[in-house]
């Protein structure tokens, strides 16, 4: 069985990238939990790249620094959705409030996804719903 997931950064509650960065190029916003990478501070050491089990930070050979999804925090601050949410043609991506999110069909660790509960990723995945089985009543 195959599974395909759209992954950028999971904006973990306890992000390892933030902990291992020697120059504090990562911060976590208190108001929404977005993990921001400040590329101008990055020295390109690769600690964050090696420490993230989800492969979110990537090395940019042109800039010679790491980069990752910023959840378009500037757009969020302006009351707009991140670019990925706005441009997804199937509307598979959305921003949710985990404090009030209650979807019995959503999971934090779907099959094939690295199970790292200590990091507590904020991403949730809606599992495919089973079709409704309709049976004919005997007349």
Sequence positions of predicted segments:
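Non-ligating segments of multi-cofactor redox enzymes
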Residues: 1-139
């Amino acid at each position: 069985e195959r599974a395909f997931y759209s992954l950028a950064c999971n904006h973990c509650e306890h992000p390892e990238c933030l902990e291992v960065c020697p120059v504090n190029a990562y911060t976590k916003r208190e108001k929404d939990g977005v993990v921001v990478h400040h590329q101008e501070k990055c020295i390109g050491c690769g600690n964050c790249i090696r420490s993230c089990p989800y492969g979110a930070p990537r090395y940019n050979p042109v800039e010679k620094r790491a980069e990752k999804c910023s959840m378009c925090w500037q757009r969020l601050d302006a009351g707009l959705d991140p670019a990925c949410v706005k441009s997804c043609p199937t509307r598979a991506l959305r921003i949710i409030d985990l404090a009030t999110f209650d979807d019995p069909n959503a999971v934090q660790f779907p099959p094939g996804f690295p199970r790292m509960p200590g990091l507590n990723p904020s991403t949730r995945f809606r599992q495919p719903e089973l079709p409704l089985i309709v049976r004919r009543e005997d007349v």
